[in-house]
């Protein structure tokens, strides 16, 4: 089966997940992937609030980036754990592989809900559907099946996940279904203007850093690929999370890649369009993700070595797609 194909048993599997969660009497841990984005935080926080509304013993284990810290309340955070207690259930959301789940061990009864085509379908129960724009879209369906009464507090993080993974409805994954779901969530009292403002706010350090990043912009393969990186002496790594989105709109480009050096290697963020697969590029680099958006971490390499690997992988994908 094509890993990027829709899940043919989507509703059957999601109903089973809902039945299991309603029947669980022990603790439920909700976790997501390392370096969480809006979908990771939105889907996990929304499900956490829904389970709490059901009276479940739920724990939300996540570390949101600065621009998303307005969403959770202080008392909603739970500390990371090294071992789950007996009888615990783990719900892993938006995590393309078990090794990316952070804050909790992948053990106990594991439920895996995700929309990454490269997900290996881990867990005792898994619902993986790459046709969905966001894991938050899937969580919306799950919350409906749980029979929880929708409130603005539950709907706001869920809509956040959809907004961020669709680029505020600008990306190709914005389908009529996505817009219908968003409209329904708005009907539960989400303050859209306030939410979108908060999602776009960035600290002054972000704009100072922007100048340094833009000075590294380079064009390759006749402008088909645009790259940039975070200078190693720039600091403020957290402020660089969305710079790949800044360079993706260079006219004439079909691939954009942003690199940043970390202790374990170089993190590579990839975006693509025009029949080019960011997923294929990421897989060549040992990573994964979606066709239009993917990433990888090149362990043990410096920036120059990482650039060499990236250029080689992009060249192969541009050739496959007929651009070279």
Swiss-Prot record:
Keywords: Exonuclease, Hydrolase, Nuclease. Gene3D superfamilies: 3.10.310.30, inorganic pyrophosphatase (n-terminal core) (3.90.1640.10). It catalyses: adenosine 3',5'-bisphosphate + H2O = AMP + phosphate. The keyword Hydrolase applies. Pfam families: DHH (PF01368), DHHA1 (PF02272). Disruption phenotype: Reduced growth in minimal medium, possibly also affected in cysteine assimilation. Its cofactor is Co(2+); Mn(2+); Zn(2+); Mg(2+). InterPro entries: DDH_dom, DHH_sf, DHHA1_dom, Oligoribo/pAp-PDE_c-di-AMP_PDE. GO terms for molecular function: 3'(2'),5'-bisphosphate nucleotidase activity; exonuclease activity; nucleic acid binding. Its EC number is 3.1.-.-, 3.1.3.7. Requires a divalent cation; Co(2+) > Mn(2+) >Zn(2+) > Mg(2+). Bifunctional enzyme which has both oligoribonuclease and pAp-phosphatase activities. Degrades short RNA and DNA oligonucleotides with a length of up to 33 nucleotides, although the enzyme is most active on shorter substrates, in a 5' to 3' direction. Converts 3'(2')-phosphoadenosine 5'-phosphate (PAP) to AMP, has very low activity on cAMP and cGMP. Belongs to the NrnA oligoribonuclease family. Oligomeric. This is Bifunctional oligoribonuclease and PAP phosphatase NrnA. It comes from Thermus thermophilus (strain ATCC 27634 / DSM 579 / HB8). The lineage of its organism: Bacteria, Thermotogati, Deinococcota, Deinococci, Thermales.
